[in-house]
């Protein structure tokens, strides 16, 4: 299997539904979805059950420990050559996995990512919020009351990494 899509979830069944729906529209089918419910009070298992026949989907419920540990929990159970770590609010455009596959076939990489972008249907306010959450100046620079740019700390989500870099088996 080429890809394992790992999604930590906390009280977001509606978002998970949108993400899973976008995954059903991918041309590339060589992937599994690993949903890790992180102690949610509003679980998404019923949503996941609706996609059981349409996606290779694995649902895990665990006590709340935060998104980082939930990503790791999912990664430990994943089978794909590449781990794609997404948040539950992601909606993948059609052709996303095909585009990644073509690029990895052309030039293999151990890790990859890219900028977030606001969907074309977003309102100006939604686009401004998206920019404020994804711009270099906010995600790795000026935030938390700082007055100048600081070290850039890359995010730990919406990225892909080759599984063999993290696990030997």
What residue spans do the PLM features occupy?
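Conserved small/polar residues in nucleotide/adenosyl-binding loops
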Residues: 167-169
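Conserved donor NDP-sugar-binding/catalytic core segment of glycosyltransferases
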Residues: 95-127, 131
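A conserved acidic beta->alpha catalytic loop
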Residues: 22, 37-46, 64-65, 87-93
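Cell-envelope/extracellular polymer assembly enzymes that use nucleotide-activated donors
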Residues: 2-4, 32
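Glycine-rich, basic loop-to-helix element that forms the pyrophosphate-binding segment
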Residues: 62-78, 99, 156-157
């Amino acid at each position: 299997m080429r890809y394992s899509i790992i999604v930590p979830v906390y009280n977001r069944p509606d978002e998970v539904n949108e993400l899973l729906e976008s995954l059903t529209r991918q041309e590339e089918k060589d992937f599994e979805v690993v949903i890790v419910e992180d102690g949610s009070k509003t679980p998404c298992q019923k949503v996941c059950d609706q996609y059981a026949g349409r996606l290779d989907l694995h649902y895990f419920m665990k006590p709340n420990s935060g998104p980082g540990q939930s990503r790791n929990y999912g990664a430990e159970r994943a089978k794909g050559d590449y781990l794609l770590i997404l948040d539950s609010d992601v909606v993948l455009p059609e052709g996303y996995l095909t585009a990644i596959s073509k690029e990895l076939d052309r030039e293999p990489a151990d890790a990859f990512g890219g900028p977030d972008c606001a969907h074309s249907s977003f309102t100006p306010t939604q686009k401004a919020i998206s920019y404020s959450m994804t711009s270099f100046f906010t995600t790795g620079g000026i935030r938390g009351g700082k007055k100048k740019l600081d070290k850039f700390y890359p995010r730990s989500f919406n990225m892909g990494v080759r599984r063999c870099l993290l696990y030997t088996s």
